[in-house]
Structure formats: structure tokens, C-alpha cells
Amino acid sequence: SEASLAAANSKKYESAIVGAVEKFSPRLNVKSWGLTTRNVANVVTTAMNAHPEVVYVARYSYLYDQTTGKVVYLKFSYKPNARTEKKQLDAAIAEVNKQINTKNMKPAEIVLAYHEFLTSTVAYDTSGAKEFDPTTGRDHMYDMYGVLVKRSSVCQGYAETMWYFLRKAGVPSGVAT
């Protein structure tokens, strides 16, 4: 079935999608993946949600064969300042990694170290819900860029940032929505 095919290859798809986006590719050939108009949204959303560090995609779309319903290409559009934001976020992540050395820490110590870092360096964004702009998003109040570069975010940004660092440190964790 389509669902089982997508599930069986989800890590492969995730890697290819995120790899293309990290290179700012405008499109990705997915013809051989067997994606359809019914499962493409789930595959792309799952891949993007697994990578909170990817904050610069404005939207995606797809091209498909109208006869078969099979998706041929994924198309990505990026925020106007995407390359700059990626560089800034990468630098901020590197700075956190410099400040927090998890090498000889137990999992609970790692959680505490990142928690202390985030709660002591990031202000909670109390500006209220902003209008969603499909090109620029919500000024990063919900993501890692808001947390690590702007130093201001709501709970979603904190949670995704914590999840990112804990996964990188090998500490099992997840984000509840």
C-alpha cells in the first residue's frame, strides 16, 4: 500500500528532502519514490518536522503525473533571507555546542545543561499571536532561529530546540503536540 511504502522508506525520504533543502535546491526528483498526491504531504511534513533546524523554507509544492497521480518533483521556495538565516542558525548551534560539552555527562545532566542554557539565555515571547505570513512565517517566534539567534520564542521554539540538542547528544526525547 502507499502508506506502508512511505513508512518503509521514511528515513531515506527524510534524508533526501532535508539534504535538498539544506542545499537550497529548488526541486527534488522523487519520481522513483512512488509518492502520490495522497501521501506526499505526510512524507514532506514528517521529514520537515523531524528537523527543527530547517527554518528557512517558505513553502513546498509538487508536480505530478495527472494520469497516474504519481508525484514527480517536489518544489521548494525559500524565505528571502534564507541563506543568511541558515548561516546565523548554524553559527548559533556551534556556539551552544562550544559552551555545553556533553562528553562525560549522564543523560539527566545533559537535559539539565541544555535546560539551564535555554532558560537563562532566551526570553519568552509575550508579543502575542502574530499574523502568519506564508513567506516569512511568524518572525521565528515558534522555531530554533527565534530561540538561538533572536533569543526570543514561545514554548514551541523552546521544545523543538531542546529536542534537537537532546537527539544530537543521544538522549531519547520527543516533542508532544
Located regions from the model:
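Ordered hydrophobic segments in well-structured contexts
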Residues: Y73-K75, Y145-G146, G174
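Secondary-structure capping and boundary motifs in well-ordered enzyme cores
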Residues: H140, V147-V154, Y158
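Secondary-structure boundary elements
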Residues: R83-V147
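Polybasic, low-complexity, intrinsically disordered segments
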Residues: K103, E109, Q156-G157, K168
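Hydrophobic/aromatic-rich core segments of domains that either
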Residues: G157-T177
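Linear, non-domain "peripheral" regions
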Residues: S1-K98
